[in-house]
């Protein structure tokens, strides 16, 4: 955590720099948990998020804050995050957001070592597009005999589409969102 002393003062040099989702290069000093911000320099290039895109950005930040260890660098994930912010800012229609959010959630879980198994079930059998599955934590997809046999049911096509990041099918979008919500809740485990 950084403390920005005097940042709210009208003549503060850093007042306009400390905005959400803007890249800044910072310098700090101090010891312990709370450090003091010494310098901040705007890196530019990131359009401001507004509307639904802003809420999506906050969602990404919440996931990162709660799931990543403090002060642990994840360069690939940060690159994915900056691309995601650019896509959110560039898409006022909101059509791409669901697909991008699922993609980011998958990348985050993979970076944390919880990569999803989506192309074969827990027995090692390839996923069948018309079969029904439930996703068991730390185990992967388990094939069901009937759709009603479990609470979190997805069709095989959804798992394969999620693997390929193809969200053109409305059922895939709906089931992927529900599945990823369940997975995120499991890994957050009360950290919300």
Segments from the language model and where they lie:
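Non-catalytic alpha-helical scaffolds and adjoining flexible linkers that form interface surfaces
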Residues: 1-192
């Amino acid at each position: 955590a950084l403390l920005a002393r005097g940042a709210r003062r009208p003549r503060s040099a850093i007042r306009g720099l400390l905005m959400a989702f803007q890249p800044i290069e910072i310098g700090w000093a101090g010891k312990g948990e709370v450090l003091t911000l010494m310098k901040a320099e705007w890196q530019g290039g990131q359009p401001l998020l507004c509307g639904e895109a802003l809420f999506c950005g906050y969602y990404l930040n919440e996931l990162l804050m709660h799931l990543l260890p403090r002060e642990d660098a994840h360069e690939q994930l940060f690159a994915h995050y900056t691309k995601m912010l650019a896509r959110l800012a560039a898409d006022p229609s909101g059509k791409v957001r669901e697909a991008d959010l699922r993609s980011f959630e998958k990348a985050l879980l993979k970076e944390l070592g919880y990569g999803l198994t989506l192309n074969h079930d827990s027995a090692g059998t390839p996923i069948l597009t018309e079969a029904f599955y439930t996703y068991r934590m730390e185990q992967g997809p388990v094939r069901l005999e009937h759709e009603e046999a479990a609470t979190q049911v997805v069709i095989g096509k959804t798992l394969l589409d999620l693997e390929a990041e193809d969200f053109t099918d409305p059922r895939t979008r709906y089931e992927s969102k529900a599945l990823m919500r369940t997975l995120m809740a499991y890994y957050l485990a009360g950290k919300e």
